[in-house]
Regions:
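Acceptor-binding helix/loop patch of EC 2.4 sugar-transfer enzymes
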Residues: 160, 382-383, 387, 539-540
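Active-site adenylate/phosphate-handling loop in enzymes that bind or generate adenylated species
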Residues: 139, 290, 348-407, 474, ...
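Adenosyl-5′-phosphate
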Residues: 1-4, 165, 169, 196-201, ...
C-alpha cells in the first residue's frame, strides 16, 4: 500500500513533493517523484514496502521503452500469473514487484488491463507519447482516489489532504453536502465534504487529455435477475473463500488478521491457520466496566477460544473509553467526517499491530455480499407478512413510544423498535429507516434556515436511483446492491483504509475478491437468508470447520460501546464541546435542537447516542480542517525517478 499524487497541466515539482509528503504515513519506507516540463506533468509516490522490498521497485516506475510512467497504490494478488503471461509475450522484468507487472500490463493491454487484475488498487499512468493520463480505481472501492481541477490543470491523490498542498481553498467545507453526512454518517461518491474535491467511484476509469477529463465505468456490482440465480454447494463456496483468502497472503513481510471471534473473521482464519509463516492475530477488548447500556458479548472471549482451537497466539488490545486524545488525529487521517464509532477501534488496533506487521486481513465485506446485517433480514422478512399485520405492528409501536427507557434496551430490542416504526412503509423506505442516523424531518429541524435551502431535496434519492435500477432483481438482491454500491465503499472501506494507513498498515479484504463477489451475487435469496438466519450458506460452508459457538453466534463485529462512552467518560467532554464558542458560532445548527438531543438521551427518552457522536465528530472535523491551517507535511527527501537509459 502506498500514497500517490499527481499534477497534470499545472505541474510544479516543489508542489508535488509537498503533496506526496503529506501522505508519508501511507508510505514511510521510501518516496519518489518525477517531473516533465515538456508534458507539464508531475507524479509523486510514498511507498509502504510489502512485495519486493528493494529500491529497484521504487515509484514512479517507468516501462522499458520510457513511454509509460506509473504511480500505484494497492496490491495485485494475481501478479505472478500475469507476469508469466507477459513474459510469454516477450516482456522482460527488472524487479519482482506487482508494480512492474501492472506497468507492463498497461503497456500490453492498454485500458483493458483493469479486466485482468485481481486486487485492490488505485493507479495513474502517464503516456508520454500520447500525452494523456489514465487512472483507475478497483471494482469495490477498497483503495481511494480523489481529484480536483486546479487552474488549467488536474490534481489527484490518495487523500484529499495532499490536494490542499496545491490549493488551500480546496479544504473549504462543502456545506451543501451536510445533510448527506447527517443522514448516512458519510458523503456519497463522487461528492466529498470538501469544496470542489471529488472521489472517483469504484469500478471507474478516468482520463485526462488536452485539458479535458472523462470518466467511464468498467465494472459494476452484479445485479442478476431472478432467473439468473444459481444455487451453490457449501463445499464450493468454502473453496472459493479459501482460494480468495490464501491468494491474499502474498507478501514479503509478516501478515496478520483482525479477529472478532465472529463468523466472518473466524472463517478467514480457518482458511489460513496452517499458513507458513503463521498469521498473527489481533483482537479488541473493552472490559466489563464499559458494557452498561451496550448489551453485547465481549469479542475477545470468542476470539481467544478460536485462537486456542487453532493453536495460534493472539494479541489483545484493550480499548479504553478515554478517546478524546485520539479523536482529533483520527479525524485528520479520515479527511472527511465519518461518524462510525469503529474509527477509534480500527485506528487503535492498527496502531498496536503496526509494530508486528504491515499487512492485516479483515472480514469486512461479508455482510454486504451474504446479507449479514439486521436490516437485510428485517426488510426481507416483512415482505412475507400481509399488509394489515405490518400496519398493526407499526400501530403498536406508536402506542408504546416513550414508555420504556431507551438506555436500558438491548441492541436487538432497539432494532425491533426501529423495525416496528417503519413496518407500514414500502420495502425501500423500511430499508432507509435502518440506514440513517438522522431522519429527513430531524435534519430540517436541526439545520439553520440558511443551510436547509442548499441541501438536496431528499438525501434518499442517491439510494433510490440505484434501487430503481434493479427492478428485475429480487428485493434482497436490490438491498445488497445498495450496500455494495454506497455503504461499503463510502463508509466501511473508507474507514478501513484511512485508519489503517494512518499507522502504515495495509488492510486486505478477501471477501471482496472480485470472483467471489460475482459468484455470491448469483446465489438465490434462500441461501443467504434462511428463515431468520443471515449468511446461511456461509455458515453451512464453515460448519464443522470452526467451533459451533461461532456458527451460532449473533453478529457483533468491532462495534464499541458508544452509548456507554456518551453517558459516562465523554459526558463532560461533550458538554465542553457543545457549549464552546467555536461550536455555537459555526452557524450550522439550531442549538436548542442540539440541547434537546442530549437531554433526551440523558433522560432515557430517546437513544440519541449515535447522533450525538456524529455531531461530535463533525465539530472535531471543523477544529482540524477549518479552525487550523492544513498540517504542513514533513520535509522528507524524495528520490527523482528518471526514465530508463535506452
Amino acid at each position: 500500500m502506498c500514497g500517490i499524487a499527481g499534477m497534470v497541466g499545472c505541474a510544479d515539482p516543489h508542489v508535488v513533493r509537498r503533496m506526496t509528503n503529506a501522505m508519508i504515513h501511507r508510505g514511510p519506507d521510501d518516496g519518489g517523484y518525477w517531473f516533465d516540463h515538456e508534458g507539464n506533468v508531475a507524479l509523486g509516490h510514498r511507498r509502504l514496502s510489502i512485495i519486493d522490498l528493494r529500491h529497484e521497485a521504487r515509484q514512479p516506475m517507468w516501462d522499458a521503452t520510457g513511454r509509460f510512467v506509473l504511480v500505484y497504490n494497492g496490491e495485485i494478488f494475481n501478479y505472478r500469473n500475469l507476469r508469466s503471461q507477459l513474459i510469454s509475450k516477450g516482456y522482460t522484468f527488472r524487479t519482482e514487484s506487482d508494480t512492474e507487472v501492472l506497468l507492463n500490463g498497461f503497456s500490453h493491454w492498454g485500458r483493458e488491463v483493469v479486466h485482468h487484475l485481481d486486487g485492490q488498487f488505485a493507479f495513474a499512468v502517464w503516456d508520454r507519447m500520447e500525452r494523456f493520463l489514465f487512472a483507475a480505481r478497483d471494482p469495490l472501492g477498497i483503495k481511494p482516489f480523489v481529484y480536483a481541477h486546479h487552474k488549467d490543470g488536474f490534481l489527484f491523490a490518495s487523500e484529499a489532504k495532499a490536494l490542499f498542498q496545491a490549493e488551500a481553498s480546496l479544504s473549504a467545507p462543502a456545506y451543501e453536502n451536510l445533510s448527506y453526512y447527517l443522514s448516512f454518517s458519510w458523503t456519497p461518491h463522487p461528492l466529498s465534504f470538501f469544496n470542489d474535491v471529488a472521489k472517483l467511484p469504484p469500478g471507474y476509469l478516468l482520463e485526462w487529455k488536452d485539458g479535458e477529463m472523462s470518466i467511464a465505468q468498467y465494472w459494476d456490482v452484479p445485479l442478476p435477475s431472478e432467473d439468473e440465480l444459481r444455487p451453490i454447494d457449501a463445499d464450493e463456496l468454502y473453496d472459493l473463500v479459501r482460494q480468495a483468502t490464501r491468494s491474499q497472503l502474498v507478501a514479503d513481510v509478516p501478515v496478520g488478521l483482525f479477529l472478532s471471534g465472529g463468523l466472518d473473521s473466524t472463517g478467514l482464519l480457518e482458511c489460513i491457520h496452517d499458513a507458513e509463516p503463521p498469521v498473527r492475530i489481533f483482537t479488541a477488548t473493552y472490559g466489563e466496566d464499559q458494557r452498561e447500556g451496550d448489551v453485547f458479548e465481549e469479542d475477545s472471549n470468542y476470539a481467544r477460544m478460536v485462537a486456542e482451537k487453532m493453536k495460534l497466539p493472539i494479541y489483545e488490545l484493550r480499548i479504553s473509553p478515554d478517546i478524546t486524545r485520539d479523536l482529533p488525529e483520527v479525524v485528520f487521517h479520515l479527511d472527511e467526517p465519518l461518524a462510525d464509532p469503529t474509527i477509534i477501534v480500527n485506528y487503535r488496533l492498527t496502531r498496536e499491530a503496526a509494530s508486528q506487521t504491515k499487512v492485516l486481513l479483515s472480514g469486512m465485506g461479508a455482510d454486504e455480499i451474504f446479507a449479514g446485517y439486521p436490516r437485510h433480514v428485517a426488510v426481507h422478512a416483512l415482505e412475507f407478512l400481509p399488509g394489515w399485520i405490518r400496519r398493526s405492528f407499526h400501530k403498536i409501536s406508536t402506542l408504546v413510544q416513550g414508555s420504556f427507557d431507551d438506555r436500558a434496551m438491548s441492541g436487538r430490542v432497539r432494532r425491533l423498535k426501529l423495525l416496528a416504526a417503519h413496518a407500514d412503509k414500502d420495502a425501500f423506505l423500511r430499508f432507509m429507516g435502518f440506514s440513517v442516523f438522522f431522519q429527513q424531518d430531524e435534519i430540517n429541524r436541526l439545520l439553520l434556515p440558511e443551510l436547509t435551502g442548499i441541501q438536496p431535496a431528499n438525501t434518499y434519492d442517491v439510494y433510490r436511483s440505484l434501487y430503481q435500477d434493479g427492478k428485475g432483481a429480487t428485493l434482497l438482491q436490490r438491498l445488497l446492491y445498495l450496500d455494495q454500491k454506497l455503504f461499503l465503499p463510502c463508509l466501511n472501506l473508507e474507514n478501513s483504509d484511512k485508519t489503517s494507513m494512518a499507522n502504515s498498515v495495509e488492510m486486505r479484504v478477501p471477501y471482496l475478491a472480485k470472483a467471489l463477489v460475482e459468484r455470491v451475487a448469483a446465489i438465490p435469496d434462500q441461501q443467504k437468508i434462511h428463515g431468520l438466519t443471515r449468511k446461511f450458506i456461509l455458515r453451512e460452508a464453515l460448519n464443522g470447520r470452526i467451533p459451533d459457538a461461532i456458527i451460532r453466534r449473533k453478529k457483533t463485529g468491532f462495534n464499541p460501546p458508544v452509548r456507554y462512552w456518551v453517558r459516562n467518560n465523554l459526558k463532560e467532554y461533550l458538554h465542553d464541546v457543545f457549549s464552546s464558542r467555536s461550536f455555537q458560532q459555526r452557524g450550522l445548527f439550531d442549538l436548542r435542537m442540539v440541547t434537546k438531543l442530549i437531554e433526551d438521551n440523558d433522560n432515557g427518552v430517546k437513544d440519541n447516542a449515535l447522533k450525538i457522536w456524529a455531531l461530535l465528530v463533525l465539530e472535531e472535523w471543523h477544529r482540524v480542517f477549518v479552525d487550523r491551517s492544513p498540517v504542513e507535511p514533513r520535509d522528507e527527501e524524495l528520490v527523482f525517478c528518471a526514465p530508463p537509459v535506452r
